[in-house]
C-alpha cells in the first residue's frame, strides 16, 4: 500500500491556534511535518512550532489521512 502524502499551507496566529493545531496533529498515527525556510519541524511539537516565525505561511506535509485533522487544516488554511 502506498502512503498518501498531501500538503497544505496554513497560517497559525498565536499560541492558542498552535496548541489547537498540535493537539489535532497529535491524534494522528502518521507523521506530519511543517516546512518553513528549509527547516523541518514535527507538527506534534508545540515548542518547535512556537520557535518558528508565526507571521509566515507554513507548509504542512501529512504522511497519511485523517478526516478530523483535515478539518483542522481547512480551518487554518491560507486561501
Feature roles, as predicted:
Residues 20-24, 69-72:
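Hydrophobic side chains in well-ordered alpha-helices
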Residues 7-9, 40:
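Well-ordered beta-strand positions in beta-sheet-rich domains
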Residues 1-4:
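Short, Lys/Arg-enriched N-terminal segments with co-localized hydrophobic residues
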Residues 50-79:
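C-terminal structural segments of small proteins and small subunits
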Residues 32-37, 75-79:
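Conserved short beta-strand edge segments in small beta-sheet-based binding/regulatory domains
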Residues 8, 23-28, 61:
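N-terminal intrinsically disordered, cationic/polar leader segments
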Residues 33-55:
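Amphipathic, hydrophobic secondary-structure cores in small proteins
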Residues 11-16:
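Short, surface-exposed ligand-recognition loops at beta-strand->loop->(often short) alpha-helix junctions
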Amino acid at each position: 500500500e502506498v502512503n498518501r502524502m498531501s500538503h497544505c499551507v496554513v497560517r497559525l496566529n498565536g499560541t492558542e491556534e498552535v496548541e489547537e493545531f498540535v493537539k489535532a496533529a497529535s491524534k494522528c498515527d502518521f507523521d506530519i511535518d511543517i516546512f518553513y525556510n528549509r527547516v523541518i519541524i514535527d507538527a506534534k511539537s508545540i515548542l518547535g512550532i512556537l520557535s518558528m516565525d508565526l507571521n509566515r505561511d507554513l507548509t504542512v506535509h501529512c504522511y497519511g489521512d485523517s478526516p478530523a485533522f483535515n478539518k483542522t487544516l481547512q480551518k487554518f488554511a491560507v486561501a
